[in-house]
């Protein structure tokens, strides 16, 4: 019942966002949540890349190792040129928005707010975190957020405690991260958004270029067989062809309006055992003590040799 209610409320929110703010609604991770049980495919690709075709760099910073039941930060960096604007769903210029996903190992999850430090509270101000599904609290989503203020998104993470969960073990784990800026080029239905380049589906002569009822443009191509092919271009992309021009199949009809992109990467973190840390400290202390004793022994031998005139 709870799952149905969540889906219903999510549908209402998304529906309203599409009506009220179509330029930003396409960035919501709702699409991935409803279409994919797991956001990471067998190939390792995050499903975000199925709609966000352009590639851009994403970076992440995590500690090399953490202790059990401790809070740490995963900082996802989504760089792009300041002031960059993209084409919204209505064809107008809008600021870029950003989003991120962090796929943690089983047992790791978003830290409860009562364990956030003051620094974390300050760094996450205005950021809303959601888990991918009720069953996957180790997958955390953020976005869309205004890009100019959120080029770095801090995720407060709680590490598991093997003493409380026998399925968790100390050792090295992989973390998968994805970061996006801007709208996608393809909708989950397979249709192109207006944030994409449009190409011709037929060869022939462009006979007419006319505005259509949706604010976009209809390009009519007369083929050699006499057939009239109408290419519907949505509002937003700029045309790069003109009437009377002869074109081939696959020729760009518009410029590429996209200025954003998606990037993903993997990193590693070690869930450190306290016993191992103590063992390492003891080992290094033993090595240091051995070195000191060797130096002292060497000096003692040198003194004896000097006294004996050797």
Swiss-Prot record:
Cofactor or coenzyme needed: heme
Cofactor details (free text): Binds 1 heme group covalently.
Residues noted as binding heme in the record, renumbered to the chain: 28, 48, 51-52
Keyword vocabulary terms for this entry: Electron transport, Heme, Iron, Membrane, Metal-binding, Photosynthesis, Signal, Thylakoid, Transmembrane, Transmembrane helix, Transport
MF annotations from Gene Ontology: electron transfer activity; heme binding; iron ion binding
Bilayer topology term: Single-pass membrane protein
SUPFAM superfamilies noted in UniProt: Cytochrome f subunit of the cytochrome b6f complex, transmembrane anchor, Cytochrome f, large domain, Rudiment single hybrid motif
Signal sequence residues: 1-27
Pfam families per UniProt: Apocytochr_F_C (PF01333), Apocytochr_F_N (PF16639)
GO terms under biological process: photosynthesis
TM helices/strands, residue ranges: 277-297
Main location per the UniProt record: membrane
Example of a GO cellular component annotation carried by this entry: plasma membrane-derived thylakoid membrane
Subcellular location: Cellular thylakoid membrane
Family: Belongs to the cytochrome f family.
Purpose: Component of the cytochrome b6-f complex, which mediates electron transfer between photosystem II (PSII) and photosystem I (PSI), cyclic electron flow around PSI, and state transitions.
Entry-linked NCBIfam families: PRK02693.1
Subunit field text: The 4 large subunits of the cytochrome b6-f complex are cytochrome b6, subunit IV (17 kDa polypeptide, PetD), cytochrome f and the Rieske protein, while the 4 small subunits are PetG, PetL, PetM and PetN. The complex functions as a dimer.
Protein name, UniProt field: Cytochrome f
Organism annotation: Prochlorococcus marinus (strain SARG / CCMP1375 / SS120)
């Amino acid at each position: 019942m709870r799952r149905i209610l969540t889906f219903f409320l999510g549908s209402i929110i998304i529906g309203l966002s599409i009506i009220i703010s179509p330029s930003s609604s396409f960035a919501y991770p709702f699409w991935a949540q409803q279409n994919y049980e797991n956001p990471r495919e067998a190939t390792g690709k995050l499903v975000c890349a199925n709609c966000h075709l352009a590639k851009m760099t994403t970076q992440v910073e995590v500690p090399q190792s953490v202790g059990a039941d401790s809070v740490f930060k995963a900082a996802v960096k989504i760089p792009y040129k300041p002031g960059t604007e993209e084409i919204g769903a209505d064809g107008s210029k809008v600021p870029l928005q950003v989003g991120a996903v962090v796929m943690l190992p089983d047992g790791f999850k978003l830290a409860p707010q009562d364990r956030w430090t003051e620094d974390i509270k300050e760094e996450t101000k205005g950021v809303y975190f959601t888990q991918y599904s009720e069953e996957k609290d180790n997958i955390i989503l953020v976005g869309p957020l205004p890009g100019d203020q959120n080029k770095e998104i801090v995720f407060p993470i709680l590490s598991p405690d093997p003493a409380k969960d026998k399925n968790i073990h100390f050792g090295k784990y992989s973390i998968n991260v994805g970061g996006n800026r801007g709208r996608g080029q393809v909708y989950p239905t397979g249709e192109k958004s207006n944030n994409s380049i449009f190409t011709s589906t037929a060869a022939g002569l462009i006979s007419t270029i006319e505005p259509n009822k949706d604010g976009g443009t209809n390009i009519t191509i007369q083929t050699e067989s006499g057939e009239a092919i109408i290419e519907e271009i949505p509002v937003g992309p700029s045309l790069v062809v003109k009437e009377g021009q002869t074109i081939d199949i696959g020729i760009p009809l518009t410029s590429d309006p996209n200025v954003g992109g998606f990037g993903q990467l993997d990193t590693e973190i070690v869930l450190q055992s306290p016993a191992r840390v103590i063992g390492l400290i003891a080992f290094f202390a033993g090595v240091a003590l051995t070195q000191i004793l060797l130096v002292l022994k060497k000096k003692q031998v040198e003194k004896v040799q000097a006294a004996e005139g050797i």
